């Protein structure tokens, strides 16, 4: 790393090689393994191998101890789990028997130990036998309890059928969850196998790393590098000496190239070893973290906190739902019992009330028959009274007609009376007829004619009045006979009505007594109805509360179902993401492997190129030394013309390097370093003519 940061030679005075090149010659690393004896080397190598094997044994022992401790914890957990399961089964069976205690059926519980006596069996057959016996006992007790439940339960209600359908649906969902659990278990087994393979690869890599970190192996590698570089260098020296007849400069150049390559390789090895050590430390820390991960580390993670919060919320909801479910079940049972008792009481009261009402209805039917008969009699009486009124109205009309006939008769009699009075006066005054004269006779005739006319005029009125009187008299006679008959009939009916009246009075007294008793019964029934209404209102309030609680439970159940569906969707998404991530991890691992292979190839190329660069640097240093020597020689033996030519060949900007780069725009010559500096500093104008140029306008003249 320090060689890369070494400053370049910028002047002719700095011709001495760096101090590090003098200090590092690479001879000690090559000569140390040659001084070691064979026995000591073998002993040191065996000690290193034994030490590495002991380290491997210690790692295996630590892993085995951690696994043993984990297995011990799991075995204790499984033992406690089996004990808890056994106690739970016994508690469930005891609770089922307590539920059947009200029916009066007693069951003989077999004498069993209060815990599992064969949890830690070593023999699998005995443990299987123990489990089969335990399962048979639990099945027998459960079948007996369920048979008693079925016999005592009777017909299945629709609620029970709905619950059984819900249980069937939940069992189907449970089977689906079991299938998912099996799939996740298989995936877990596959991941555990992959983890075991990765740990095996890790152990192998750690073993190789320990072997690479061993001092003996490093010495062997250094010796191999020295042996690989030495013959080539010696061969080159021999050939070069053969060709140049013992040219020591070229041998020294080759030697320095070999030493530079060896030092560069040593530096690369140091870098690789440092990287390997850092990776090993990181691997050991990661392994320690993986092995020493505690529950607190998991508790501190955000995923665990989120899962814990969700789990606590679900547990709280489940506890509240269980408590409310238990409370509602107890309240429903109590209400069912009250409902049955209330129904029996209502049926008894209704039967009693119906019997009383039927008896009252019979009495009311009898009363209705009596009332209808009384109504018929009253209707008959009213019709008779109407007929009587009609007859009286007709008699009144007849009386009126008789009065009119009487008036006619009175007028006729008045006219007759007046006529008779006149005739009497005339008779009293009139003399003898024979003594009368013609005039007197004529007068008398006219008078008689007048009387005759008046009599003729009176006769129709008299006849009419006579006819009317005759008719009225006949009618009166007939009416009188009819009234006599009606009077006899009415007298008989009056006697009958008196008898009916006394019977109706008796019936009215009995009805009044019945009405009093019915009113008393009605007051009692109204009190009972008021009590029933109060109970019905209370039941309605309870039903309303229960319906509200049921709606709340349905809503909570719906929210839980939606959350469950969301959790299923999220779990499916997580599974899909894990699958996609696993695919991505596999793709990335393949890509990383390919990239690692490519990087290894590139690294090898870089190593070879770095060694070549070191060799070229050594050659460059020798060339610079030769140049400086020739420069000094030339300066010591140069003339003014040579000095002028030399200054003309030097760059006009730095006066240090020779002109080797020309600008196409103007044709002036400068050194490539100055031109590159001006391009990088954005001073892209010729210092001689100030013409602009670009990177494409630069042209090398010679090398």
UniProtKB/Swiss-Prot annotation:
Q: Which CDD domains does the protein's record reference?
A: RING-HC_Bre1-like
Which reaction does this enzyme catalyse, per its entry?
S-ubiquitinyl-[E2 ubiquitin-conjugating enzyme]-L-cysteine + [acceptor protein]-L-lysine = [E2 ubiquitin-conjugating enzyme]-L-cysteine + N(6)-ubiquitinyl-[acceptor protein]-L-lysine
Q: Keywords of this protein's UniProt record, alphabetized?
A: Chromatin regulator, Coiled coil, Metal-binding, Nucleus, Transferase, Ubl conjugation pathway, Zinc, Zinc-finger
Q: Tell whether Zinc is among the UniProt keywords.
A: yes
Q: Keyword Coiled coil on this protein?
A: yes
Task: From the Swiss-Prot or TrEMBL record, state where the protein is found.
Answer: Nucleus
Coiled-coil residues:
49-75, 170-459, 512-569, 603-635
Looking at its record, which EC class is this enzyme? Answer: transferase
Polar residues: bias regions: 214-246
Q: Do you know which InterPro entries this protein is assigned to?
A: E3_ubiquit_lig_Bre1 (IPR013956), Znf_RING (IPR001841), Znf_RING/FYVE/PHD (IPR013083), Znf_RING_CS (IPR017907)
- In the UniProt record, the signal sequence range is none
Matching entries from SMART domains are given as:
RING
Provide a GO biological process annotation.
Answer: protein ubiquitination
ZnF endpoints (RING-type): 651-690
Q: Which GO terms describe its cellular component?
A: HULC complex; nucleus
Task: Select a single GO molecular function from the record's annotations and give it.
Answer: ubiquitin protein ligase activity
Which pathway features in its UniProt record? Protein modification; protein ubiquitination
Protein name as annotated? E3 ubiquitin-protein ligase BRE1
- Organism (species): Gibberella zeae (strain ATCC MYA-4620 / CBS 123657 / FGSC 9075 / NRRL 31084 / PH-1) (Wheat head blight fungus)
Q: What is the lineage of its organism?
A: Eukaryota, Fungi, Dikarya, Ascomycota, Pezizomycotina
């Amino acid at each position: 790393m320090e060689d890369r940061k070494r400053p370049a030679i910028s002047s002719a005075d700095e011709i001495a090689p760096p101090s590090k090149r003098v200090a590092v010659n690479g001879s000690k690393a090559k000569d140390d393994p040659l001084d070691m004896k064979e026995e000591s080397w073998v002993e040191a190598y065996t000690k290193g191998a034994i030490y590495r094997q002991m380290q491997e044994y210690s790692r295996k022992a630590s892993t085995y101890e951690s696994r043993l401790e984990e297995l011990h914890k799991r075995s204790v957990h499984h033992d406690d789990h089996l004990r808890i399961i056994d106690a739970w089964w016994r508690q469930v069976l005891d609770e089922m028997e307590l539920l059947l205690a009200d029916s009066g059926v007693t069951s003989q519980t077999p004498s069993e130990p209060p815990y599992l006596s064969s949890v830690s069996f070593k023999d699998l057959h005995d443990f299987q036998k123990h489990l089969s016996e335990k399962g048979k006992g639990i099945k027998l007790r459960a079948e007996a309890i369920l048979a008693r439940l079925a016999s005592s339960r009777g017909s299945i209600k629709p609620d029970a059928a709905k619950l059984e359908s819900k249980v069937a649906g939940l069992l189907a969902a449970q089977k689906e969850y079991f299938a998912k659990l099996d799939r996740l278990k298989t995936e877990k087994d596959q991941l555990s196998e992959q983890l075991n393979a990765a740990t095996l690869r890790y152990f192998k890599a750690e073993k190789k790393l320990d072997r690479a970190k061993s001092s003996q192996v490093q010495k062997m590698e250094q010796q191999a590098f020295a042996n690989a570089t030495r013959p080539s260098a010696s061969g080159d020296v021999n050939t070069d000496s053969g060709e140049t007849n013992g040219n020591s400069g070229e041998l020294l150049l080759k030697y320095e190239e070999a030493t530079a390559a060896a030092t560069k390789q040593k530096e690369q090895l140091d870098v690789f070893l440092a990287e390997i050590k850092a990776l090993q430390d990181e691997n050991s820390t990661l392994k320690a973290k993986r092995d020493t991960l505690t529950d607190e580390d998991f508790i501190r993670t955000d995923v665990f906190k989120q899962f814990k919060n969700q789990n606590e919320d679900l547990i709280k909801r489940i506890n509240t739902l269980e408590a409310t479910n238990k409370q509602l079940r107890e309240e429903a049972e109590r209400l069912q019992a009250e409902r049955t008792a209330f129904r029996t009481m209502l049926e008894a009261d209704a039967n009693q009330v119906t019997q009383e009402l039927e008896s009252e209805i019979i009495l009311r039917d009898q009363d209705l028959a009596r009332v209808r008969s009384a109504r018929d009699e009253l209707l008959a009486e009213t019709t008779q009274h109407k007929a009587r009124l009609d007859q009286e109205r007709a008699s009144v009309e007849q009386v009126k007609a008789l009065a009119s006939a009487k008036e006619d008769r009175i007028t006729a009699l008045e006219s007759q009376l007046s006529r008779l009075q006149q005739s009497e006066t005339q008779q009293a005054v009139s003399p003898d007829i024979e003594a009368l004269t013609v005039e007197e006779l004529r007068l008398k005739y006219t008078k008689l004619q007048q009387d005759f006319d008046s009599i003729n005029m009176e006769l129709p009125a008299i006849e009419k009045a006579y006819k009317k009187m005759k008719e009225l008299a006949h009618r009166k006679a007939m009416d009188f006979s009819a009234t006599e008959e009606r009077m006899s009939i009415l007298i008989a009916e009056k006697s009958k009505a008196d008898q009916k009246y006394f019977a109706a009075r008796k019936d009215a007294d009995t009805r009044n007594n019945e009405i009093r008793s019915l009113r008393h019964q009605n007051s009692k029934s109204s009190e009972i109805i008021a009590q029933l209404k109060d109970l019905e209102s209370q039941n309605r309030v309870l039903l309303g509360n229960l319906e509200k609680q049921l709606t709340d439970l349905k809503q909570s159940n719906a929210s839980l179902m939606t959350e469950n569906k969301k959790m299923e969707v999220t779990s499916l998404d997580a599974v899909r993401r894990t699958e996609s991530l696993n695919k991505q991890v596999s793709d990335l691992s393949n890509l990383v492997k390919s990239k690692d292979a490519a990087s290894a190839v590139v690294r090898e190329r870089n190593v070879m190129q770095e060694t070549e660069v070191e060799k070229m640097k050594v050659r460059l240093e020798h060339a610079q030394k030769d140049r400086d020597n020739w420069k000094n020689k030339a300066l010591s033996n140069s003339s003014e013309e040579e000095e002028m030519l030399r200054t003309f060949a030097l760059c006009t900007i730095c006066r240090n390097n020779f002109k080797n780069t020309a600008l196409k725009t103007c044709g002036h010559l400068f050194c490539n370093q100055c031109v590159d500096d001006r391009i990088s500093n954005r001073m892209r104008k010729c210092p001689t003519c100030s013409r602009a140029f670009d990177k494409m306008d630069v042209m090398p003249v010679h090398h």
